[in-house]
Amino acid sequence: GVLKAASAAAVRNRPMSAKIQVRPVNPQTCQTLIAAGADPLIARLCAARDVAGPDELLDKLSALLPYTLLKNCETAAVRLADAIEKQENILIVADYDADGATACAVGIKGLQAMGARADFMVPNRFENGYGLTPEIAEAAAAAGARLLLTVDNGIASMAGVARAAALGLEVIVTDHHLPAEETPDCIIVNPNQKGCGFQSKSLAGVGVIFFVLMALRAELRRRNYFSDELKEPNLGELLDLVALGTVADVVPLDHNNRILVSQGLKRMRLGKMRPGIRALFEVARRDWRKAQPFDMGFALGPRINAAGRLDDMSVGIACLLADNDAAAQTLAAQLNDLN
């Protein structure tokens, strides 16, 4: 018995063997990065992470991929611009998780900043299933919606899109999940769909709707829509939400995603963020002045995901949409209690 206990203690106290993965480094890329002014250690780390050249180290917004490469992005922008000009009711169909919630908040805030009549709906997946189902299409029609916009879902909603069409509703699907052979019969913006030349296949759902909003702003600008009464919005103000959703969805941080996250974190560290994000930092006892990807993935994201355990799954979205600190703090506390 004594021997058994001693051997068990030895196993418990044995240091864990670390598994070190050595990534292959392209020496030519490494030299190019050093020649461009990168520190040799940073150059080696970047070359081992498939950074192809110095341009990929730029984190300016101007280095983002152009939305023109994202298939149907401009088509979606034209339809949304028409809806805004006609003041049609746009209903966003979202999911409650961190990517879906941030995508919904980005969609609502971006559309409203451009004068749209926009609202959202979060299907209760235990009652209605996931995403745009026929039941959700019927509820949307009953609520007076004219155009449905899915965020972070919809690529598999064949039946829901068909039911919406039968009810006279049009649908735009924005999603990033891998499509099956059959896709819904509507406008689809998804970097992973067939024939899409957008190089960042890792764009999160929140990133897809952000690119659609950039295309929409350009389309409205082309129509001379903005004026002194309704000024052109600064979409950079949504990057705190984009960064949060991108990190929390654990998509690979390719160059395009790295720009979105880096810019969002810079804004957070300056205190430029939604009251809901600030409140989530506070309840998680994290310092937003030193915001890191860790905070997004392990402190804020899980608290938004906790809304899935509530009867009302839209509490996470409500927290992100809150326009004042008091409302944001109440909702963040609710999410914190659940987490």
Segments (PLM) and residue ranges:
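Short, ordered loop/turn segments at secondary-structure junctions
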Residues: D95-Y96, P123-F126, N153-G154, L169, ...
